[in-house]
């Protein structure tokens, strides 16, 4: 059990986005890091922030969306300061340094190509969800 049984007012929560960087400034403490837990369980990267295209739109649309996203990501990775200035528009009060830290937590080699480990991570997450009857079993096409 997480939290403090002696203090029912103390409630655990899942922090996402910039909360991962700023939680201590708000007097919060980390009980568990889900990314670390996932890696301990699977030895795989945690599958976050994926772009999904509905297959029924057809392969031409799927291919064009993938091309456009890849081009955009490549531009951002080749122009990091410009991309960071753009990200600051959505930074929800973060400093430039905190925004840089947050962006670089997630912009990495997996951003351009999640590889075999990334594919296994997605399939593992979906399998676990289906095993627990949270989601139906599904076939996934990863391009």
Task: Pin down the residues of each PLM region.
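Short loop/turn and capping residues at structural boundaries
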Residues: 16, 118, 140-141
């Amino acid at each position: 059990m997480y939290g403090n049984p002696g203090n029912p007012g103390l409630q655990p929560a899942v922090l996402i986005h910039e909360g991962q960087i700023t939680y201590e400034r708000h007097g919060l403490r980390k009980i568990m890091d889900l990314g670390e837990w996932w890696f301990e369980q699977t030895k795989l990267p945690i599958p976050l922030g994926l772009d999904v295209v509905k297959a029924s739109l057809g392969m031409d649309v799927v291919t064009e969306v993938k091309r456009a996203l890849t081009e955009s990501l490549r531009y951002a990775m080749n122009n990091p300061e410009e991309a960071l200035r753009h990200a600051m528009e959505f930074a929800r009060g973060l400093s430039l340094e905190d925004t840089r830290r947050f962006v670089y937590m997630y912009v990495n080699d997996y951003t351009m190509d999640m590889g075999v480990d990334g594919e296994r991570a997605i399939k593992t997450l979906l399998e676990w969800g289906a095993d627990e009857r949270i989601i139906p079993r599904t076939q996934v096409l990863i391009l």
